[in-house]
Regions:
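The conserved acidic donor/metal-binding loop of glycosyltransferases
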Residues: 97-101
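A conserved acidic beta->alpha catalytic loop
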Residues: 28, 45-54, 74
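Conserved donor NDP-sugar-binding/catalytic core segment of glycosyltransferases
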Residues: 104-134
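Cell-envelope/extracellular polymer assembly enzymes that use nucleotide-activated donors
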Residues: 8-10, 40, 181
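Short beta-strand/loop segment that forms part of the nucleotide-sugar
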Residues: 37-48, 68-70
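Glycine-rich, basic loop-to-helix element that forms the pyrophosphate-binding segment
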Residues: 71-88
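Short aromatic/hydrophobic "clamp" motif used to bind/position activated sugar donors
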Residues: 93
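Short, well-formed alpha-helical segments that are part of the catalytic scaffolds
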Residues: 18-32, 55
Length: 209
């Protein structure tokens, strides 16, 4: 996509023991078809006891990108996000789960859609990764037919906003659904669904859903 003025983009990836996923997440992210923007990636490692951090640092960083790894001894996604927001330099903030893989077009579409002088929210078009268990497959089949998944900008797995949008609240509260909390700070007219796809794995098993 062309015609977008240069932007500063921060991609915040909270990660707690995500060694099995972080390499795939970053590899897909770095393959984004985007140029002409300053992009920093902040891996927000919180309470990790595996080699998430080492694996994140091993993925080759493309020219024009910057990787920063912020390590917290304590676990907790929301506290990590608050710390990441303070460290981020972007005028576009993208919040990406460590087990999600974006397709190449999505970041460029986000940069084009989010006008810097407005409070706006955007997300891509989700593709739920095929589940392993029969129960999760059935749940996923119903989930993807929900109206907010099919036609809205749901934001689970990845969501983005302008700085003006992020200024609508302070620290992230101690809640479960950060994407829902963020989305509800924007009116339907301020939420943008983009055609760029991303792949999101649903948690497995009845007890985790």
């Amino acid at each position: 996509m062309t015609g977008s003025p240069p932007r500063r983009i921060s991609v915040l990836i909270p990660a707690h023991n995500e060694a099995d996923y972080i390499t795939g997440c970053l590899t897909a992210l770095y393959a984004s078809a985007i140029s002409g923007h300053g992009i920093e990636v902040l891996v927000l490692a919180n309470g990790c006891t595996d080699d998430t951090v080492a694996r994140a640092r091993c993925v080759p960083v493309p020219d024009g990108w910057e990787l920063r790894v912020l390590e917290r001894a304590e676990g907790g996604k929301l506290a990590a996000l608050t710390e990441g927001d303070k460290a981020a330099n972007g005028d576009i903030l993208i919040y990406l789960d460590a087990d999600v893989q974006v397709e190449p077009e999505l970041l460029s579409q986000i940069a084009h859609a989010l006008c810097p002088d407005r409070a706006l929210y955007a997300s891509g078009s989700p593709c739920v990764t095929p589940a392993q268990s029969a129960f999760t497959r059935a749940y996923a089949s119903a989930w993807v037919r929900l109206p907010f998944v099919r036609t809205g900008a749901p934001g689970f797995g990845i969501f983005a906003m302008t700085r003006a949008g992020r200024e609508r609240w302070g620290q992230w509260p101690a809640i479960i659904s950060d994407d829902t909390y963020a989305r509800l700070h924007f009116s339907p007219e301020e939420r943008i669904r983009l055609p760029g796809r991303y792949h999101w794995p649903m948690v497995e098993g009845f007890s985790n859903l």
